[in-house]
From Swiss-Prot:
Organism name: Bos taurus (Bovine)
Lineage: Eukaryota, Metazoa, Chordata, Craniata, Vertebrata
Family annotation (InterPro entries): TMEM230, TMEM_230/134
Full protein name: Transmembrane protein 230
Topology term for the membrane: Multi-pass membrane protein
Transmembrane segments: 51-71, 79-99
Role: Involved in trafficking and recycling of synaptic vesicles.
Amino acid sequence: MMPSRTNLATGIPSSKVKYSRLSSTDDGYIDLQFKKSPPKIPYKAIALATVLFLIGAFLIIIGSLLLAGYISKGGADRAVPVLIIGILVFLPGFYHLRIAYYASKGYRGYSYDDIPDFDD
């Protein structure tokens, strides 16, 4: 049992906190302060990046098929806006998925901290 701290004047323990002496060979450092905590994986941000990637890829494919004339004969007036929106949605999704992949594989220079997270 660990000794509790006592009030010297009355001899009564002043709290329920247990104290113990530090070893005399201790240099003031503990191993826990040097251990790296496991990275916090931003699952919501990765899910959003996946959705953006898939929607963007779908819009790029549809825009390409519209431009080629396989879906309808509308021509470039319908295909170009779909392609532009597809590219604008695809690029952030691809970028963040690439960071998440490299961070999960442990590549140097990539971490989950580079992915913006929803702080909730």
